[in-house]
Amino acid sequence: MSDPFGEENVEITEEFVEGDINENDLIDGNVEYVDGNGISFETTTFDNSNNNNNNNNHNNNSYNSGFDGDLSSVDGDMKPKETAPAMREYLEKHEKEMQEKKKKSEEKRQKKIAEAKQSLDNFYSEREAKKKTALKNNRDHNKSLETDSTSGNTTHTWESVVSMIDLQAKPNPANKDTSRMREILIRLKNQPIV
């Protein structure tokens, strides 16, 4: 057989799927099936040479003449063979590894959940502390403003307005330029509108 890619010796392998076995190719008539758990089943097939010799004879004896042993149906009447020790050892080892992996994964998950809860608790406690401090600072500032306004130190309101702002602050490029507003407030303080 020639290969389109230039290799002369090409080995052809076939995989048999259940039901695809050619009984003429079997030597001893036994077929071994392996289920998903690694348990193998062995079934016996009919001898085709005897069936072909007696195919004109409709007697049941000719049908059963090539049959050696009892026929096991695929419906589940088969008796499972013992799993090979190496396969059993591998399956046990694999199962243990999967259980350990699952256990470690669950431990990591619980650890992440605990860390997330702790992080949320810290965030909320810091937030509450900041809110309380800001509230206290605002109350103190309002009290100082009230005492200044009731003390009567200023003769008119524009002086009190100018005292609330920082006249020495330099303009910040990120913020709007407030130099014009400061200039207006200083003029009003010096020459109040009557």
Curated annotation (Swiss-Prot):
GO molecular function, one term: structural molecule activity
GO terms for biological process, alphabetical: clathrin coat assembly; clathrin-dependent endocytosis; culmination involved in sorocarp development; intracellular protein transport; intracellular water homeostasis; mitotic cytokinesis; receptor-mediated endocytosis
Location of region: Required for binding clathrin heavy chain, localization to punctae, and for cytokinesis and fruiting body development: 124-194
Comp. bias regions, Polar residues: 147-156
Compositionally biased tracts (Low complexity): 48-65
Pfam family, one: Clathrin_lg_ch
Alphabetically ordered keywords of this record: Coated pit, Cytoplasmic vesicle, Membrane
Family under the similarity heading: Belongs to the clathrin light chain family.
Subunit structure: Clathrin coats are formed from molecules containing 3 heavy chains and 3 light chains.
Biological role stated in the UniProt entry: Clathrin is the major protein of the polyhedral coat of coated pits and vesicles.
Protein name as catalogued: Clathrin light chain
Organism this protein belongs to: Dictyostelium discoideum (Social amoeba)
Gene that this sequence comes from: clc
